[in-house]
Amino acid sequence: MDVSMTTGIELTEELSVLNGLTEITRFAGVGTAVSETSYSQTELLDILDVEDPKIRSVFLNSAIDRRFLTLPPENPGGGRLAEPQGDLLDKHKKIAVDMGCRALEACLKSAGATLSDLRHLCCVTSTGFLTPGLSALIIREMGIDPHCSRSDIVGMGCNAGLNALNVVSGWSAAHPGELGVVLCSEACSAAYALDGTMRTAVVNSLFGDGSAALAVISGDGRVAGPRVLKFASYIITDAVDAMRYDWDRDQDRFSFFLDPQIPYVVGAHAEIVVDRLLSGTGLRRSDIGHWLVHSGGKKVVDAVVVNLGLSRHDVRHTTGVLRDYGNLSSGSFLFSYERLSEEDVTRPGDYGVLMTMGPGSTIEMALIQW
């Protein structure tokens, strides 16, 4: 297959999804799921008994209306009980598997496929640690063929969905005609700490539960979804400690840490990654018709918009997902892709950029074409 003819841009060695392979991976279907209960930011402030005006301001100025969460049990004295780490790990397992199964079902339905068609399952999570991994638990829960190959990406954070897509795109190119799925399942409710500090308040104001699945396949010209052309990665090693999920000795549990400078760090480096992504393709930034950016938070999205010269329309799905769900971690860009797909505004030949950001600090991007 002459890939340069099918993509409309000159294929260079750098542009190959996997050097030496001629098959191009396409998106075949997408599905999402959330946990059972949602709350407005005001409701959460009341439920958690938050009175500090600075913390209340963080919640109310987040550009988030609602989030889906599984809150801790009620405290008879007011607020919610602090859950021990063991209970949080149990919560992660239960919620991540439940949401993951439902997102996978929706994804396969979108792709016109069944569980028996699935040949590779790559599961992504950073909100809990499981051995056996999430992929094994979902294969057992759904009765997927035990011969299905699988992989798990754990602990890479909000950028990990694109890392997984990179892996599965390579697998797909090597297995034309076979269906692979990237499944991100993040039970952010299982990663909360309630200690009244500003550090945890920022996290507690931002993240929500969500799962997203993307089916991909190569070698099938009947699939109408966009093709994956190229990936670019960048790790800002000077900011390796700026986003962390590590052990809090005072809380006796894992907890998130987000440096206030993160939006500016991400924004300042976004152009570097876009330029590398488009290098050798003959494309300019103005040729990109669709931007699907991780809903990392209001300030992060604003920094990306300013530094890449995007419009609010360009990131309408990003801000819409943030408003309706909060930061869903690794799968949030797929929630945005699902909304773009439902709009039915893409046309053959259109280019899109997927962008995720996370710990490292890391920026991941992918170039796609309809």
UniProtKB/Swiss-Prot annotation:
EC number(s) from the headed UniProt entry: 2.3.1.246
Annotated SUPFAM superfamilies: Thiolase-like (SSF53901)
Catalytic activity: 4 malonyl-CoA + 4 H(+) = (3,5-dihydroxyphenyl)acetyl-CoA + 4 CO2 + 3 CoA + H2O
Active site, per annotation: 158
Pathway of action: Antibiotic biosynthesis; vancomycin biosynthesis
InterPro entries: Chalcone/stilbene_synt_C, Chalcone/stilbene_synt_N, DPA-CoA_Synthase, Polyketide_synthase_type-III, Thiolase-like
GO molecular function: acyltransferase activity, transferring groups other than amino-acyl groups
Domain of life according to the entry: Bacteria
Disulfide linkage: none
Keyword Transferase among UniProt keywords: yes
Record's keyword terms, sorted: Antibiotic biosynthesis, Transferase
Biological processes per GO annotation: polyketide biosynthetic process; vancomycin biosynthetic process
Functional description taken from the UniProt entry: Involved in the biosynthesis of the nonproteinogenic amino acid monomer (S)-3,5-dihydroxyphenylglycine (Dpg) responsible of the production of vancomycin and teicoplanin antibiotics. Catalyzes the Claisen condensation of four molecules of malonyl-CoA to yield 3,5-dihydroxyphenylacetyl-CoA (DPA-CoA) and three free coenzyme A (CoA). DpgA requires the presence of the dehydratases DpgB and DpgD to facilitate the aromatization of the DPA-S-DgpA or DPA-S-CoA intermediate.
Family: Belongs to the thiolase-like superfamily. Chalcone/stilbene synthases family.
Protein's name in the database: 3,5-dihydroxyphenylacetyl-CoA synthase
Native source species: Amycolatopsis orientalis
Primary gene name: dpgA
